[in-house]
Curated annotation (Swiss-Prot):
Region Disordered: start-end pairs: 424-465
Name by which UniProt lists this protein: Polycomb group protein EMBRYONIC FLOWER 2
GO MF terms held by the record: chromatin DNA binding; DNA binding; DNA-binding transcription factor activity; transcription cis-regulatory region binding; zinc ion binding
Residue intervals of every C2H2-type zinc finger in the record: 324-347
Record-stated family: Belongs to the VEFS (VRN2-EMF2-FIS2-SU(Z)12) family.
Organism in which the protein naturally occurs: Arabidopsis thaliana (Mouse-ear cress)
Comp. bias intervals (Basic and acidic residues): 424-446
Gene (UniProt): EMF2
InterPro entries: EMF2-like_DUF7651 (IPR056068), Polycomb_protein_VEFS-Box (IPR019135)
Length: 631
């Protein structure tokens, strides 16, 4: 089981709840015999762990859909991105009211071409525009703000060095009352243009300030204050599907009547992926003292303590997994809640108890004794090791031919002829012997050459009179009656014993793989709907005999193919190439002896090839194999 073993709790100062959650084995003093028994108890974890390891290795190449989705979610959650927030923090020029700037549009735009396009000085492309409509709040800080999600620092460095990204500020101050302005409510509709105020902040300068700040590496917020000067310009908006373009034309002689306004803007940046990680998450466990190891493990988010209890929950082994990982299948569950759902549903051979405190997230693991220990019946015999026979229909036992023949020959028949077959099970023989009265046991009289058995107290004269057929029939009839009663009781007891054994076992349907009730198991109805091959072949031949426009060889070939497809369960189109090669190897010797069958088979493969069910390579392999058989 993977994980980081914890040190002894005697060297750490933990609370009482933590001690109860993560105590070690070293505190319990046990003898050598108890230590051996404890090791055997701990070894019981090997079987379920080996099973889960096999399942985990099989799932490496083809992981489950839910685990793939969870993996993508975890990657997106821990991906380092920058959350940028832009808002107005005040105005320096008191001559012009800041309220006139609203509504103010803030765009994160990319420069399409650094060269001027026609009469426009710059063309930017953006996806969405944030609108600030409210005024300044307390201390001159705007209550409305614009949020943008930037890529990670490495990718942002390339974008910043290129100088293509910039934050645009566009205001239609007084544009609705001006003959040169445009309606701010129509900025999202179609191609429009007009006069406005604008300014920009290159992202390159912001990235330089963020890179110098030590708070960015620690996952803390970085605030940058900038002064933007709103300049008059003429813009034209053009919408193209999801992306929009804004073309800006700065006049060579701007109007002097309207003085430019400087606005103080605050830009906050914070890494989203790193805020959920502790600063201790970047530390490694190497070169760390034992006393400091527990403190770092405690502060690391995503670390879960697993306590494996054994020896009647008196001892336990403790280990730690990272990133909310499962210790059995190594699946990262993204959170402790996800781990709580994953463990009971996926690893049902174990019991799990979840603990959450201010210092630790722990899981107590124990074995399910009802699944690991096999059930024992009344005779202390494991039913898995005991062989028994069951039949839903009672069958009649027949005497062997030698016994029937000897019943007609009186002198060669002993009074103690065996009625039960030798195929009776040992339980029936023992029960029959226990049911026969002591006076009915037979003794051998007259030596081994006589071959006759008589009950005790029988005189030799009576033995000599056994040659009488009437006497033999009367004695045999009474003996048969006695043994028939004993045999009936034995069979009934055997059925009861087999029924009790069946009740302790769980049977599953061979097709649906669903548990079956005992009534379904004992019923005479065939729930599997199995088709007898002989009956199916007979019906197939009868159906083919009705065809009048095909030859005898074609009928035989169709019958061979239908029988092969039914027995081998060829159901999908992808099974056809394999089925053709297997059919050629199975029926190749028969087709070689009858050349007409080979031609019928080749014509059939050509038809499959015309329908796209068989490739040329497989057809060539089949013909090559048949040619080798002909040689």
């Amino acid at each position: 089981m993977p994980g980081i073993p914890l040190v002894s709790r005697e060297t750490s100062s933990c609370s009482r709840s933590t001690e109860q959650m993560c105590h070690e084995d070293s505190r319990l003093r046990i003898s050598e015999e108890e230590e051996i028994a404890a090791e055997e108890s701990l070894a019981a974890y090997c079987k379920p762990v080996e099973l889960y390891n096999i399942i985990q290795r099989r799932a490496i190449r083809n992981p489950l859909f839910l685990q793939r989705c969870l993996h993508y979610k975890i990657e997106a959650k821990h991906k380092r991105r920058i959350q940028m927030t832009v808002f107005l923090s005040g105005a320096i020029d008191a001559g012009v009211q800041t309220q006139k700037l609203f509504p103010l549009y803030i765009l994160l735009a990319r420069l399409v071409s650094p060269k001027p396009v026609a009469e426009y000085s710059a063309v930017y492309r953006f996806s969405r525009a944030c609108i600030l409509t409210g005024g300044l709040g307390v201390d001159g800080v705007s209550q409305a703000q614009a949020n943008f999600l930037l890529p990670d620092m490495n990718r942002l460095a390339l974008e910043a060095k290129s100088g293509s990204l910039a934050i645009l500020f566009i205001s239609f101050a007084g544009a609705q009352n001006s003959q040169f302005g445009i309606d701010s409510g129509k900025i999202h509709s179609g191609n429009i243009g007009g006069h406005c105020l604008w300014s920009k902040i290159p992202l390159q300068s912001l990235y330089a300030s963020w890179q110098k700040s030590p708070n960015m590496d620690l996952g803390q917020r970085v605030d940058t204050v900038s002064l933007v000067e709103m300049q008059p310009c003429f813009i034209k908006l053009k919408s193209m599907s999801e992306e929009k373009c804004v073309s800006i034309q700065v006049p060579s002689n701007p109007l002097t009547s309207s003085s430019p306004q400087q606005v103080q803007v605050t830009i906050s940046a914070e890494e989203v992926g790193s805020t959920e990680k502790s600063p201790y998450s970047s530390f490694s466990y190497n070169d760390i003292s034992s006393s400091s190891l527990l403190q770092i493990i405690r502060l690391r988010t995503g670390n879960v303590v697993f306590n494996y209890r054994y020896y009647n929950n008196k001892l336990q082994k403790t280990e730690v997994t990272e990133d909310f990982s499962c210790p059995f299948c190594l699946v990262k569950c993204a959170s402790f809640k996800g781990l709580r759902y994953h463990l009971p549903s996926t690893h049902d051979l174990l019991n799990f108890e979840f603990w959450v405190t201010e210092e630790f997230q722990a899981v107590n693991v124990s074995l399910k004794t009802e699944t690991m220990i096999s059930k024992v019946n009344e005779d202390d015999v494991d039913p898995k090791q005991q062989t028994f026979f069951f039949s839903s229909k009672k069958f009649r036992r027949r005497r062997q031919k030698s016994q029937v023949r000897s019943s007609r020959q009186g002198p060669h028949l002993g009074l103690g002829c065996e009625v039960l077959d030798k195929t009776d099970d040992a339980h029936s023989v023992r029960s029959e012997k226990s049911r026969i009265p002591p006076g009915k046991h037979y003794e051998r009289i007259g030596g081994a050459e006589s071959g006759q058995r008589v009950p005790p107290g029988t005189s030799p004269a009576d033995v000599q009179s056994c040659g009488d057929p009437d006497y033999v029939q009367s004695i045999a009839g009474s003996t048969m009656l006695q043994f028939a009663k004993t045999r009936k009781i034995s069979i009934e007891r055997s059925d009861l014993r087999n029924r009790s054994l069946l009740q302790k076992r769980q049977f599953f349907h061979s097709h649906r793989a669903q548990p079956m009730a005992l009534e379904q198991v004992l019923s005479d109805r065939d729930s599997e709907d199995e088709v007898d091959d002989d009956v199916a072949d007979f019906e197939d031949r009868r159906m083919l005999d009705d065809f009048v426009d095909v030859t005898k060889d074609e009928k035989q070939m169709m019958h061979m193919w239908n029988s092969f497809v039914r027995k081998q369960r060829v159901l999908a189109d992808g099974h056809i190439p394999w089925a053709c090669e297997a059919f050629s190897r199975l029926h190749g010797p028969i087709m070689v002896r009858t050349p007409h069958l080979i031609w019928c088979w080749r014509v059939f493969m050509v038809k499959l090839w015309n329908h796209g069910l068989l490739d040329a390579r497989t057809m060539n392999n089949c013909n090559t194999f048949l040619e080798q058989l002909q040689i």
